[in-house]
Amino acid sequence: MNFDKPINRLNTHSAKWDMMKPLYGVDPEKGTSMWVADMDFEPPVAVSDALKTMADQGVYGYYGNDGDYRNAICGWMDRRHGWNVNPAHIFTTHGLVNGTALCVQTFTEPGDGVVLFTPVYHAFARVISAANRRVVECKLAQNDGRYEMDFDAYDAQMDGSEKMVILCSPHNPGGRVWTVDELKQVAAFAQRHDLILVSDEIHHDLTFGAKHTAMPLAAPEITDRLVMMTASTKTFNI
């Protein structure tokens, strides 16, 4: 990707820029759009070339099973994160929010509590409420300008009606890259309260200074209650 070549996306039906005025009353010519995780750079040439190849086929029918796709994911996770993924364990959804909704609907019932470490990506609460589940806010503490988790306080909040916990790792919007010890504490929290753990790791390739650890590597003992979600969208701006 060429980070020295920003693209002017005004009047291209870009939600990031063309929706600034109607949503927030801010002239995009005068403001800086920071309300959505969407980069103003072209994706890698390999991505563009692959899309062009598919478009040039001229027929856009239903897409079938693609082993190369799963193998590419496995290779990336192995090279970048040291995680050996079983391709049979990969389930494709129409985006991370859709994947979250499917998890909520599959593993919980109406009225159940779903734990969020807040503040966090706003779509999680929307998905939970839309499914007639309850948002259980476990508030992150601020310590020297960074968010931290207080599991003594969170344990005291639980009443047994909670069935799921959603973690954002790395954290959105705080930017925290959780340590291995913190991830282990989240896993132990899920075990103590018999919760399905959904780990949103969509920003796993975009960290600065700290190293991201995939939850299955940090706490392999909870893989039977873990759903890890990620995507190529943030990494490659697609």
Which role fits each region the language model picked out?
Residues 201:
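Walker B catalytic acidic pair
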Residues 218-238:
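Active-site PLP attachment segment
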Residues 35-37, 117, 231-232:
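A secondary-structure boundary/capping signal
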Residues 169, 197-198:
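Residue-level marker for buried hydrophobic side chains located in beta-strands
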Residues 2-95, 102:
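N-terminal small-domain helix-loop-helix segment of the aminotransferase-like
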Residues 37-39, 169-173, 234:
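Short glycine-rich anion-binding loops that position phosphate/pyrophosphate groups of nucleotides
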Residues 60-188, 205-220, 227:
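Conserved core of the PLP fold type I
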